Amino acid sequence: DCLLSRGLGDVYKRQILLLPISGILLLWKGGTVVSLLNEVFTSQSGCAEVLLCTGVCAIASMNDMATPSVSLEGKSLWLAQSLPVKPWQVLRAKLKVQLALTALPALVPLACMAFILPVTAALPLVFAEVLAYIAFSACLGLTLGVARANLTWTSELMPIKQSLAVTIALFGGWLYAIVFAGLYLWQGWKLGAAAYLAIAAAVTLAVTALLFRWLKTKGAQRFAML
């Protein structure tokens, strides 16, 4: 797979390492951060859980290898298309790479949260929301990658760093994090952290299911015609 041979260079290695590093930083200074957040947002309980969840989602959004994975095939795309497998199976393999190399590193900061956050109903829902976001990010990135594939690049950096699809996926991930945190600080805190996280995870999974269905049907057809 072209993604494995090219995409996982220094750029993606650094992005993957950001998640475990953030977990180590949480163990080191997480207690201080949680105390500070609780002091600043005294009247808005659960902010520590939601904002730390937001931080992990924002970092995970930087690991966008699924987005350029189709474009990185370049003129050798015909090799993937000529394999005795369905187009959807090729796309599914790209999704699995993104999920494995994002969800597994994300378990490090999530596990570290369990040591610094109080054990409440919100804690397991932080895990659920982060993993739901990672699935959403992978499906969104691959959807953009298929819809805006560029197979005529002259430098491997073009589909990785100079692609509109990558830009949309990256800034879309950050926008998601901003809206997620902003809604909680605005009105969501009235629901409580657990209820808010549960609703956010459910909505995220619903949108992910729609993107997944598009990839499996129209996305696979479009990939076969590139």
Label each residue range with its predicted role.
Residues 2-8, 12:
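Single conserved hydrophobic/aromatic residue that forms the stacking wall/gate
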Residues 10-32, 52-57:
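Hydrophobic alpha-helical transmembrane segments of multi-pass membrane transport/permease proteins
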Residues 20-25, 87-88, 92-121, 125, ...:
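Hydrophobic alpha-helical transmembrane segments that constitute the membrane-spanning cores
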Residues 28-50, 109-130, 153-160, 188-196:
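Membrane-interfacial helix-loop-helix connectors in multipass membrane proteins
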Residues 36-40, 62-83:
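Transmembrane helix boundary and interhelical loop/hinge segments in multi-pass membrane proteins
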Residues 47-65:
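Long, hydrophobic alpha-helical segments
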Residues 126, 131-174, 224-225:
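A structural motif at transmembrane helix-loop-helix junctions in multipass membrane proteins
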Residues 133-137, 173-220:
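Alpha-helical transmembrane segments of multi-pass membrane transporters/translocases
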